[in-house]
Amino acid sequence: MGDPKFHHKKYSTPRHPWEKDRIDEENKILVKYGLKNKREIWRSEAMLSSIRSQARYLRARLRASDANAQKQLERMIKRLSRYKILSDKATLDDVLSLTVENILDRRLQTIVFKKNLALSEKQARQLITHGHITVNGRRVTVPGMLVEAQYEDTIAYYENSPIANELHPIRQALLSPAERVKEEAEKEAAASEDGGEQDE
């Protein structure tokens, strides 16, 4: 088990380090999610492996009509639905069909990008590590944090961050062309109103 005082690896390296198909697949995931290195993939794979291992164990117990197995399955699904990895209506087959991308989709870095708070996955990582992002009002600097569904809507820029200003270049770059046109029109309208008041 090891001494709880010391940190232990939360992942295991591939058994066959030079498999081309696996390397190609990992490289695609690395680029898609803007990950720092493959250890972040392996951590998610270790988590997924643990979930699926528990699900297979529960399936065997359910076949043996174990009364407590159904309750444990419900607790597992409830825990996964809390992180929006599965819905609360999910079944054992849904648990067994999970992929590593289902886990990676719930990382703070991925959600910041999907919420249009960053121009890319890599920029999302940078904003988080530099303290520009808050979750439920608290600054978070861990890109790999799994976000609970109840806190997803609370993800925002830190109020004292320069990026919280809508005129910041990053905020302007995030606007769609239609939003930019609308914003420019509003600025022009406000400027003309100010000019009219001064003339009076």
UniProtKB/Swiss-Prot annotation:
Amino acid composition bias (Basic and acidic residues), ranges on this chain: 179-190
InterPro entries in UniProt: Ribosomal_uS4, Ribosomal_uS4_arc, Ribosomal_uS4_CS, Ribosomal_uS4_euk/arc, Ribosomal_uS4_N, S4_RNA-bd, S4_RNA-bd_sf
TM helices/strands, residue ranges: none
SMART domains in UniProt: Ribosomal_S4, S4
Region described as Disordered: spans on this chain: 178-200
Cellular component annotations (GO), alphabetically ordered: small ribosomal subunit
NCBIfam families registered for this protein in UniProt: PRK04051.1 (NF003139), uS4_arch (TIGR01018)
Protein's name according to its UniProt entry: Small ribosomal subunit protein uS4
Organism of origin: Thermoplasma volcanium (strain ATCC 51530 / DSM 4299 / JCM 9571 / NBRC 15438 / GSS1)
Gene name in the database record: rps4
